């Protein structure tokens, strides 16, 4: 669970709701036709721009914002270091049984190719190709959410214009002008909320998760290729430690290099 995402989501909602209550009547901020125009209209327009696999799968992707995305870079260094030590002592074939239980499919596949004697350049190409396709897939999803964030305020403004047209057509009833104006502006509020409370922050968080996953896979590629080349475990560690934050780097330097 990503605690920061929950704090941001529910905290911002609570502040907005409190502002509405303190400013008057919170019920005045709910208008079902405005929801249909802003949320439904902007979402359905995405069907025109993206295939069904994206428009129907976006909610599952957005749910990842609330899941922890710790890729355990420190543990990656420790594991690859231990494998490098073992391969130098007992040979690459000794790794075969150990890697079968790895949860990380990317690391497991790369190391299996090493054990099978595949050329280092071929292993690099395979792993970098998989990483490239993952990046492309993630960037499409982030682009989808950013596109929705662009459309939502536009549909909010569209609803407002529609409401203003209706208001102008009923100018003779001056007693309802204020209420009609308020209803017209609610759709603009919804569009702004969708973009600034939900969609833009979600795209940003998914982008950060994407960067962290790319970094972890780049570390794995470097480590797997170092094991394939028979590099000394300390050389492997020095290559991978540059990816870590200063605190973890100092701890692992003391553990792996300076002992």
UniProtKB/Swiss-Prot annotation:
GO terms for cellular component: plasma membrane. Residues 205-259 are cytoplasmic. The keyword Cell inner membrane applies. It comes from Treponema phagedenis. This is Motility protein A. GO terms for biological process: bacterial-type flagellum-dependent swarming motility; chemotaxis; proton transmembrane transport. Its main location: membrane. Belongs to the MotA family. It is found in: Cell inner membrane. MotA and MotB comprise the stator element of the flagellar motor complex. Required for rotation of the flagellar motor. Probable transmembrane proton channel. The chain crosses the membrane at residues 3-23, 28-48, 148-168, 184-204. Each stator complex is composed of 4 MotA and 2 MotB subunits. 2 A subunits and 1 B subunit are thought to form a single ion channel, so that each stator complex contains two channels. Keywords: Cell inner membrane, Cell membrane, Chemotaxis, Flagellar rotation, Hydrogen ion transport, Ion transport, Membrane, Transmembrane, Transmembrane helix, Transport. It is a multi-pass membrane protein. The keyword Ligase does not apply. PANTHER family: CHEMOTAXIS PROTEIN MOTA, MOTILITY PROTEIN A.
């Amino acid at each position: 669970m990503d605690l920061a995402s929950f704090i941001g989501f529910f905290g911002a909602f609570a502040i907005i709701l409190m502002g509405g209550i303190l400013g008057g009547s919170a019920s005045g901020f709910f208008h079902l036709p405005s929801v249909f125009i802003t949320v439904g209209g902007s979402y359905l327009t995405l069907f025109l721009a993206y295939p069904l696999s994206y428009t129907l799968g976006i909610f599952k992707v957005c749910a990842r914002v609330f899941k922890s995305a710790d890729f355990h870079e420190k543990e990656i260094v420790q594991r690859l270091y231990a494998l490098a030590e073992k391969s130098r002592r007992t040979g690459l074939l000794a790794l075969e049984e150990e890697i079968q239980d790895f949860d990380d499919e990317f690391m497991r596949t790369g190391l299996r190719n090493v054990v099978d004697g595949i050329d280092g350049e071929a292993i690099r190409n395979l792993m970098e190709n998989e990483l490239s396709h993952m990046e492309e897939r993630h960037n499409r999803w982030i682009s989808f959410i950013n596109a929705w964030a662009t459309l939502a305020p536009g549909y909010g403004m569209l609803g407002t214009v529609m409401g203003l047209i209706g208001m102008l057509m009923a100018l003779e009833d001056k007693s309802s002008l204020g209420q009609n104006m308020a209803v017209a502006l609610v759709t603009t509020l919804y569009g702004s909320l969708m973009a600034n409370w939900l969609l833009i922050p979600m795209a940003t968080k998914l982008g950060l998760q994407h960067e962290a996953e790319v970094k972890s896979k780049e570390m794995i590629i470097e480590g797997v290729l170092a094991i394939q080349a028979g590099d000394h475990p300390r050389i492997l560690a020095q290559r991978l430690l540059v990816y870590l934050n200063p605190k973890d780097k100092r701890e692992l330097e003391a553990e792996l290099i300076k002992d």
